[in-house]
Amino acid sequence: MIVEMTGIHKSFSGNPVLKDVSFTLEKGEIHALMGENGAGKSTLMKILTGIYERDSGTVKIKGREVHYKHPKEAEADGLAVIHQELNILPELTVAENLFVGKERTYGKTGWIKSKEMNRLAEEKLAELGLKVKGTERAGNLSVGKQQLIEIAKALMTNADIIIMDEPTAALTDREIDTLFATVRELQKKGVTFVYISHRMEEIFSLCQRITVLRDGEYVGTKVIAETSFDEIVKMMVGRALGNRFPEHTLTPGDVKLEIKHLTRAGEFENVSLSVRAGEILGISGLMGAGRSELVETIFGYRKADSGEVWIDGKQAAIKGPDQAIAQGIGFVSEDRKSKGLIVDFSIRDNISLTNLSRISTSSWISSEKERSLYEELAKKLHVKASGPSQQAKSLSGGNQQKIVIAKWLGIEPKILILDEPTRGVDVGAKKEIYTIMNELAKQGVAIIMVSSELPEVIGLSTRVAVMFEGKLMHILERDELSEETIMHYATGGDKHVRQ
């Protein structure tokens, strides 16, 4: 065994997070680590890599017991981590991000070899399918491209044990395929991987073994070839989940929102589509197709160069999010940490921000109304929290996403836009979010959902609009939906539009 963790215990402020957990890695394997948000996966890996110190238990790396007090010590032993949360320095260039702390210099002079770093950065990212200049400012790139920089950074350390924590959350299917090909090539060279993900399809495609944690405890380890989706879900949640997606019984009504010939130069062009009350319109496409840019423009985050937005049969002038909200539009961003939540604020304060008119009397916030709103929405969305004062950053990914959705449900939207609504969310919380979306649609809310997960798009959508390089290629009816058909149009096939 290249890694042996035995009897690991860890508590924070007296609250046990890991209780007698054991975990092993065989050299050259890709080992999945699964569990619901809050199960202890990331904490266990942070102990392995020296970010946290264990309270008790043993950790052996390559047969030697270790007591890392700093991540640099783990890195020196050949461990690298691709974190779920981006660690990009937005003001630095792509190359500077890849080489931060490891800059190439001219001997004793200390002068940085910028051209060499730019070239190496471009070569490494090209291996992952990303064509970008090393001199490009990292903050200008999309979340998905920033994720590829994080992955390249870890791969450049020449580590022989790599921990990947939700590495594909912001990637398209094509980028995932390229990443997996790279991982398999490294595996052939003896590199060992821990793969943390909530995406069952990826785990069953890539990994050889899987370990499941639940509530900070070790549940078991299975050989992938000898287990099933249902068995792993039951290990994770302690019960069978039943059908993955809600039964599709939606009956769309009148057109709620329509966009006509909407254009934003360099991002999307001449897009026309509509969404009806009581339907879920999926928007699919590869990275760079313009999906997020389109919905952000509808919501007023971005300014359209031309085109029109119509709501309830009337042309709407939306020049900012405040005007979109006034028109009854809610927006769940793909990046909940920077655009969806103020993570240092409490749950109560995050929910209150979009609902001030509902909880205020004569410009004064009513604590009673504020608490009542929290209790109503927390109950409706099954939020697991100690109370309204708990900081958003201390919640699991699934509960953070529920808070983002909750703050928009408070405004009782007519139209709800969700951009990657289940990114970084565990299988149990995903099902709860799917149920919430379906119930909202049944109540007459018009829902637009952008998602990179094709099973999610197919499982939830009434219709699917497919984009390619900023153009709307086709709108598929529910009975036309399949992964093959969506990918056909997402890669540029049959350049025509039908609504």
Swiss-Prot record:
It catalyses: D-ribose(out) + ATP + H2O = D-ribose(in) + ADP + phosphate + H(+). ATP binds at residues 35-42. Coiled coil: none annotated. Its EC number is 7.5.2.7. It is found in: Cell membrane. Residues 3-240, 250-494 form the ABC transporter domain. The complex is composed of an ATP-binding protein (RbsA), two transmembrane proteins (RbsC) and a solute-binding protein (RbsB). This is Ribose import ATP-binding protein RbsA. The gene is rbsA.
